[in-house]
Amino acid sequence: MSISKEQVAAIAGLARLQLDEDKKELFAGQFAQILEYMDTLNEVDTDGVAPLYSPVQHATVYREDEVQRHCSREQVLANAPEEDGTFFIVPRIV
């Protein structure tokens, strides 16, 4: 399967990329290689093979939410460049 430079330009436009003609030619070749590889994968016989959603067999482990206090307010505020004793002071944005 091949892809034209015009198709590459359309894809680049969607991504808001500006490509010169050399890059369009380069990417057209690379896209063609990727699509050929996908065609090769599509030829693999997968009849009787269960769908695989994750290569790792694991179960989600749930735990109870427990409130834990890791740092005191003073310890947290000690890392702030500026604070008022209760809150971080940050520059005004708007």
From Swiss-Prot:
It catalyses: L-glutamyl-tRNA(Gln) + L-glutamine + ATP + H2O = L-glutaminyl-tRNA(Gln) + L-glutamate + ADP + phosphate + H(+); L-aspartyl-tRNA(Asn) + L-glutamine + ATP + H2O = L-asparaginyl-tRNA(Asn) + L-glutamate + ADP + phosphate + 2 H(+). SUPFAM superfamilies: Glu-tRNAGln amidotransferase C subunit (SSF141000). GO terms for biological process: glutaminyl-tRNAGln biosynthesis via transamidation; regulation of translational fidelity; translation. Keywords: ATP-binding, Ligase, Nucleotide-binding, Protein biosynthesis. Its EC number is 6.3.5.-. GO terms for molecular function: asparaginyl-tRNA synthase (glutamine-hydrolyzing) activity; ATP binding; glutaminyl-tRNA synthase (glutamine-hydrolyzing) activity. InterPro entries: Asp/Glu-ADT_sf_sub_c, GatC. It comes from the Bacteria. Allows the formation of correctly charged Asn-tRNA(Asn) or Gln-tRNA(Gln) through the transamidation of misacylated Asp-tRNA(Asn) or Glu-tRNA(Gln) in organisms which lack either or both of asparaginyl-tRNA or glutaminyl-tRNA synthetases. The reaction takes place in the presence of glutamine and ATP through an activated phospho-Asp-tRNA(Asn) or phospho-Glu-tRNA(Gln). Belongs to the GatC family. Heterotrimer of A, B and C subunits. PANTHER family: GLUTAMYL-TRNA(GLN) AMIDOTRANSFERASE SUBUNIT C, MITOCHONDRIAL (PTHR15004:SF0). This is Aspartyl/glutamyl-tRNA(Asn/Gln) amidotransferase subunit C. It comes from Oleidesulfovibrio alaskensis (strain ATCC BAA-1058 / DSM 17464 / G20). The gene is gatC.
